[in-house]
Swiss-Prot record:
One of its GO terms (biological process) is L-proline biosynthetic process. GO terms for cellular component: cytosol. Coiled coil: none annotated. This is Glutamate 5-kinase. ATP binds at residues 15, 174-175, 216-222. Its EC number is 2.7.2.11. It comes from Dechloromonas aromatica (strain RCB). The gene is proB. Its main location: cytoplasm. Substrate binds at residues 55, 142, 154. Belongs to the glutamate 5-kinase family. Disulfide bonds: none annotated. Catalyzes the transfer of a phosphate group to glutamate to form L-glutamate 5-phosphate.
Length: 372
């Protein structure tokens, strides 16, 4: 395991599974939760930013309601999630408060990250919380979703959050030592894989598909999550949450568990996402000065926009059109079409006078823009 890969990570997402959070379904494991908070506090002292993705609401609710068997009814699962989330948040808040850290609860659905406007709002909120030194604690909003309450949700959610905040690393803590060449519970010759490339097709065959009766995912979902996180440049570590100080040791670059390495630089991965996965909702007509600015790698400011065509909301993908009608770039607009028309040809300082507020100083930030 290359020690520099995670040691250089400044922004990390840590995902802990239900089996760890609830001590295999016997109630919240207070000792483990307090220990994770202690480890994350150490990382905060090292000026590392950490987002915690925690499973456990449904499992905690099952324990509180006295249910030994995971129900199959969606509404019963949602009821358990509602009951359990209360206990989960209270415990995390108390654990981090011992180290002088504030926490924030964020409940997401996959739809929140698929919708561009909500995606930008979630990203802005998370970035603000991290700037404030707060530890965001994220869980799937199981009480309102339907299809998302299924196999592997929070492994996927951890990867999506890593993409969302452009994290350097995703740490997935589980009840296994890492990824093996075969299921070690069935094959005594199975060996631990120390390092591999995220997205290697052979890994999914090694991972199998078994989960626990408390959680919903198995190792296969973690391998798929690592592949997804790698698209935005994040390396993924899969390790046992029952090791001594796994979060600290991984963040320091120690060889714990399995490291699945992203072969893509973060910015390149983000640009690829912008190029391949966005449907254009409108067009911004630019002046020559704005065209030159974009070619120089700068953001698109309102003063360089002549007109906005089409009807689109904040976060929508738009094409940037040169004065001679050529598409020169595309990106995510920080303003809806109505707002864009109002602030076109205005300086950044004039945005607030025009709209009464400022979402962002740019119409399209350079990180959300790719040249055509």
């Amino acid at each position: 395991m290359n020690p520099t890969r995670l040691a250089n990570a400044k922004r990390l997402v840590v995902k802990v599974g239900s089996a760890l959070v609830t001590n295999n379904g016997t109630g919240l494991d207070l000792s483990a939760i307090n220990d994770w908070a202690r480890q994350i506090a150490v990382l905060r002292q090292q000026d590392k930013e950490v987002v915690l993705v925690s499973s456990g609401a449904i499992a905690c609710g099952m324990q509180r309601l006295g249910w030994a068997k995971r129900p199959k009814s969606v509404h019963e699962l949602q009821a358990a999630a509602a009951v359990g989330q209360m206990g989960l948040v209270q415990v995390y808040e108390g654990a981090f408060a011992k180290h002088g850290l504030h926490t924030a609860q964020i409940l997401l659905t996959h739809d929140d990250l698929a919708d561009r406007k909500r995606y930008l709002n979630a990203r802005s909120t998370l970035n603000t919380l991290l700037e404030l030194g707060v530890v965001p604690i994220i869980n799937e909003n199981d009480t309102v979703v339907t299809d998302e309450i299924k196999f592997g949700d929070n492994d996927t959610l951890g990867a999506l959050v890593a993409n969302l905040i452009e994290a350097d690393a995703l740490i997935i803590l589980t009840d296994q030592q890492g990824l093996y060449t075969a299921d070690p519970r069935k094959d005594p010759s199975a060996t631990l894989i120390n390092e591999a490339t995220a997205g290697d097709e052979t890994l999914e065959g090694m991972a199998g598909g078994a989960g626990t009766r408390i959680g919903t995912g198995g190792m296969i979902t973690k391998v798929i999550a690592a592949k997804r996180a790698a698209r935005s440049g994040a390396h993924t570590a899969i390790a046992s949450g029952r090791e001594t100080d796994p979060i600290i040791r991984l963040a320091n670059g120690e060889p714990v568990g399995t490291l699945l390495v992203s072969q893509t630089q973060p910015l390149a991965a983000r640009k690829q996402w912008l190029a391949d996965h966005l449907q254009l909702a409108g067009r911004l007509i630019l002046d020559a000065g704005a065209v030159n600015a974009l070619h120089a790698g700068k953001s698109l400011l309102p003063i360089g926009v002549i007109a906005a065509e089409g009807e689109f909301e904040r976060g929508a993908a738009v094409a940037c059109i040169s004065p001679d009608g050529r598409e020169i770039a595309r990106g995510l607009s920080n303003y809806g079409s109505g707002e864009a028309r109002l602030i076109a040809r205005k300086t950044t300082q004039e945005i607030e006078n025009t709209l009464g507020y400022v979402d962002e100083p740019e119409i399209i930030h350079r990180d959300n823009l790719i040249l055509s």
